[in-house]
């Protein structure tokens, strides 16, 4: 049975960074020896972040989206993502690429 890595990603008004984050992160994750899930937590974004996340989720079954009705803050978003994750290992990241995906392996 494959080990599962959960990557929990806090998102707040990151429409400009989401596509790049997704491409860079999945590119890295596909090369590791674990199955993975990307759990994006939309923290009440007012831009197009949620629409982008829903599109990514529709095209990639490894992408899961949790969405808050309003901004509850970074810590609440991370806790929700941790609660939703089912991995044997968990990594927390921000969607703004502050944490380079290259650090995952």
What residue spans do the PLM features occupy?
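Structured catalytic core of nucleotide-sugar glycosyltransferases
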Residues: 1-105
């Amino acid at each position: 049975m494959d080990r599962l890595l959960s990557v929990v990603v806090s998102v707040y008004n990151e429409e400009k960074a989401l596509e790049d984050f997704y491409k860079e992160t999945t590119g890295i994750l596909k090369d590791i020896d674990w199955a993975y899930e990307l759990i994006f937590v939309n923290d009440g974004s007012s831009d197009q972040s949620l629409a982008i996340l829903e599109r990514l989720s529709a095209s990639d079954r490894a992408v899961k989206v949790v969405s808050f009705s309003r901004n509850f803050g970074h810590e609440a978003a991370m806790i929700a993502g941790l609660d939703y994750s089912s991995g044997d290992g968990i990594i927390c990241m921000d969607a703004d690429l502050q944490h380079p995906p290259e650090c995952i392996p």
